[in-house]
């Protein structure tokens, strides 16, 4: 006998065909508002729609100059396809309105910056004011760049596009999803075979008999076809959560299909560990415009469970709620390595757009690898490689414009300077001119404590070498050298492709000249001659955080607080075992930065947790690379409003750090929880992995990992659900012991198990102590840390203190 997929019961689901299809899908859009950047070009308000705009001309299309990737203006027809919710440029270029992240007025993209001095592209004021760009596709930051015939035309196009995109993002996401699938059919109604194809495309398959029953159930006029409303109802049926019915009926007090207010109060208290008042319950019922205000239906209850108000992470963590009056060293700081690279370390594209992306994601420490430019103006690129080059001044302008969009807290520039003295002076002039009062006065010599986070709002802190920087000698080891010869980054040249290892040397081995420091640019494991580069006083006087070689935690405690250590990832692993307490104590007043080993040519990442576990504030990751280390980093810095600074837990701060040992099997006394129990219930609308075979339906499974200190490491997996990515159901429970819940993270990833291996679908990472107990929704994220529309996981979380 045929049954519904995963034995789910779809009986008693309200499928009233009288309601409008729009009302069936009322979860808020997961998309962020489009960013409009026009403030420095003109004072025209594009957000106020010009009532004289004729949208018909945009539907028909208008001729415009599009700048190609080679900087050549080409005449193209620009069309707003409102039926398909996309913008069309020429015959091939199509972008969904909902995928557009930003509209920029002027010459503000890599295309414009790269070609604005060419013969094809004018750089006069009028040309700039006639130009605009569309940025889309998430972190890939693809662009379409245009020049209009005049300023009024540009204003009309940008204003119209802004409103169309905003409307597309604000219209209910689920309704958009159903409408999009329906529009792809191009018919007024669909038959059984078409329905089967659509559902397969949506990752749902079942037997023909079950699908016939589903279609019959939704076919209100029994004509063996489904119109849009009937199709909407069928998808609503498949998206429902019948597995929540036993929980619902547990609190109905004998009221059949309704749970009274007292039952709601009991549900929130017992299942969700929340205290709700009668008035709050009534407000919740009112939200769904129900005719009764004394009880809630299962449909509305289910809608709440799967909605924005029931996400797994505590709502207050989406704001800056932590104490920001502590010294800078008390915070974990969201940090980037080789920020300018969009890909491979040896041949990738260097782009200022990566700084925009990284800063908008909440990153507060970015890296600039600066070299002499052929025209006398410093450039940024990955030295001695085939990576492309960008102007240092352009990056500074980007940092000033974007550095404080997510929060007012300071931005740290990690400067890897390989320039001659004249171009160092040029660097200093650029920074003084562009940053101005954002550059704070360097700290006095005897500083024992760094300034508070609050006192450094809107400041740009320069990290780099001074004439007193410790000089390193080059060892004769190769890239695979022993642990005793680990690079400690005395000269902090982690930005260059350098497989040479460094040993610390005594100050006496430094050059007698106090105005030089040493850099090695070797790309092999052989001994290289040290190159000495003089430091310009004009540059040196701007340095706020002075790079300094690390010897030991105890030694660090004796030097001024403005001196910062950079440690290669292997060194950190060594310190976790050899002197964890000393490093934790040193991190009370000093910043410690961890960076990837030089052999990570593919821009892969290291696990940031070992560094965090001993107090290292900055884990400099290749943020252009999506992998578990970056997901863990995103989970950490989704806390405290995503401002880029997260207060270190008590075990790493004065009062507890003196007795803290991350390698001890003893449970931390201040750990809030001793156990976490996770029931993985079900998922909805899991997308196909991009490399999946065309037409196949995914077979999803869930992996749960606790990531923390040495003893907080455990991985569990659910069973595989065959041929169902639309509404898979697991109902599996897992238990995780916790030794230090302050630092522990829960990483959940969903994968497709197929014949060729594991295919990633989505993930979600969250700090354990930020998880709300009870039945909660986790939104799944893609490789770019963007929420996947409509894809979510329903879990129940239980904590034992």
UniProtKB/Swiss-Prot annotation:
Claim: Nucleotide-binding is one of the keywords in the record: no
GO biological process, one term: sorocarp sorus development
Ranges of Acidic residues composition bias in the record: 489-506
Active site: 337, 382
Record keyword Transport present: no
Region annotated Disordered, chain positions: 471-523
Residue ranges occupied by any PI-PLC X-box domain in the UniProt entry: 322-464
Sequence positions that bind substrate: 463, 566, 593
Top-rank lineage group of the source organism: Eukaryota
Residues modified to Phosphoserine: 524
Keywords for the protein's UniProt record, in alphabetical order: Calcium, Hydrolase, Lipid degradation, Lipid metabolism, Metal-binding, Phosphoprotein, Transducer
Coiled-coil stretches noted in the UniProt entry, renumbered to this chain: none
Name recorded for this polypeptide: 1-phosphatidylinositol 4,5-bisphosphate phosphodiesterase
